[in-house]
A protein has these predicted regions:
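Core structural elements
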Residues: 139-151, 256-279, 289-306, 319, ...
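Strongly charged, low-complexity linkers/loops
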Residues: 311-322, 329, 334-377
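Basic, nucleic-acid-interacting segments
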Residues: 1-246, 252, 262, 284-288, ...
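Short, structured loop/turn "capping" segments at alpha-beta junctions
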Residues: 186, 289, 303-307, 332-336, ...
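Amphipathic alpha-helical segments within well-ordered protein domains
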Residues: 252-256, 279-283, 301, 322-328, ...
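Short acidic alpha-helix initiation/capping motifs at coil-to-helix transition points
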Residues: 242-249, 254-259, 269-274, 315-319, ...
Length: 377
């Protein structure tokens, strides 16, 4: 039977990508023989994908908003992890058969930067919808990229080259820019581009030939006979959407309303655990959210980097950081608050207890009072 949570997850991602959701959940068999899936077929959704015809807006290389259209999103089972070496390959079947969501994009991206930002936006959606942790280096989020060039004014695409082994955002940008330059050089010299699969070599910053592709394979799709189709009710679909956690862009808009800069909001949202910590810290007093954000980005991240701890391992409770930020808002200097911050981490207790331990007093800021002290002296 269908995995209910997988269906809910696919609906949430499809909605976030502005796709038209198909209420009919039906699976098909993709038949092929290859070492990545030994049973000889893959369960997928060729004819009834979860969603069709959506889009995602990103910031282009020129800083302007660019819309990337999305053809479809569908569920299918994962294949094994393959590690290729000079004269042998290793196959890890531990993830084979696990459900995944595949997003098929339209050919709207024109350079490595746009592709990188598109994948980054996808990652933000899957992380904040709790679909995946989005760790590309661990394979939780993967992408293959098809690159082809065409003359200016032409409506027909050139020969397609598929790129693999793109396990970071930086690799995506570098691999595409290199491949665009490589194909340009081929075409300008009169050498036709071959239809092939290439991998990105991180050490050299180049793409390397893996295999030459032949004509398209006929996978002979037919309905999966062992999984009955399900017609989802409108209530089920809307409930899946309504119960989706707050997504990256919605959180970012809210943080900007709190007074955070776009840069600070992006830094906090780059780590979902940091965003959760921030939410709890300013829950008592949203007026000091900007001060809390400054402590979080500078002092907390500084401590984490120095001590090699994750956000979940950071020892200071959220409300204590909020209390330290409140002291600064009440007139204590930033330097004094940093002393309190460090003392609480080292000795525990509340912000007020640390202030008393350190015998820190608020510095006088009344000019008349200061002038009176000067006259007395």
């Amino acid at each position: 039977i269908e995995n209910k949570q997988a269906v809910i997850t696919a609906i949430r991602v499809a909605n976030a990508l502005h796709l038209t959701i198909d209420p009919l959940v039906r699976f098909d068999l993709k038949n092929y023989f290859y070492s990545d899936l030994l049973k000889g077929f893959q369960i997928t959704q060729q004819f009834n994908p979860d969603g069709k015809e959506g889009y995602l807006d990103i910031k282009g290389k020129d800083g302007q908003i660019k819309r990337i259209h999305i053809e479809r999103i569908h569920m299918e089972e994962d294949t094994c992890k393959q590690l290729h070496f000079a004269d042998y390959s290793l196959l890890d079947y531990n993830r084979a058969g696990v459900p995944l969501v595949e997003i098929v994009s339209c050919p709207d991206m024109r350079n490595g930067t746009e592709a990188m930002r598109y994948v980054e936006a996808i990652r933000n959606i899957v992380v904040y919808s709790l679909t995946s942790d989005g760790k590309m280096e661990e394979g939780s989020l993967r992408c293959d990229v098809n690159v082809s060039l065409r003359p200016y004014g032409s409506t027909e695409f050139g020969t397609k080259v598929e790129l693999k082994n793109l396990n970071s955002l930086k690799n995506i940008e570098q691999a595409l820019d290199y491949e665009i330059a490589r194909q340009s050089a081929c075409l300008l010299s009169g050498t036709p581009v071959q239809q092939e699969t290439r991998r990105f070599d991180e050490a050299s910053g180049r793409t390397v030939l893996m295999r030459v592709k032949t004509d398209a394979v006929d996978y002979k799709y037919f309905p999966e006979p062992n999984i009955a189709p399900i017609q989802l009710s409108e209530e089920f679909v809307q409930n899946a959407i309504a119960t989706c956690p707050e997504l990256y862009e919605a959180k970012k808009a809210r943080y900007l309303e709190l007074g955070l800069s776009e840069t600070d909001a992006d830094i906090i949202l780059s780590d979902i655990d940091m965003a959760a910590y921030f939410e709890k810290a300013f829950a008592k007093n949203g007026k000091i959210a900007k001060t809390i954000a400054n402590f979080l980005i500078v002092e907390v991240n500084g401590y984490r980097n120095k001590n090699g701890v994750s956000m979940k391992e950071f020892p200071l409770p959220e409300d204590t950081l909020a209390d330290i930020a409140s002291l600064q808002e009440d007139g204590y200097t930033h330097k004094q608050c940093i002393q309190i911050f460090n003392d609480v981490i080292e000795n525990g207790g509340s912000a007020e207890e640390a202030r008393l331990r350190l015998k820190i007093e608020k510095q006088a800021s009344d000019d008349g009072l200061v002038l009176g002290f000067v006259n007395e002296v």
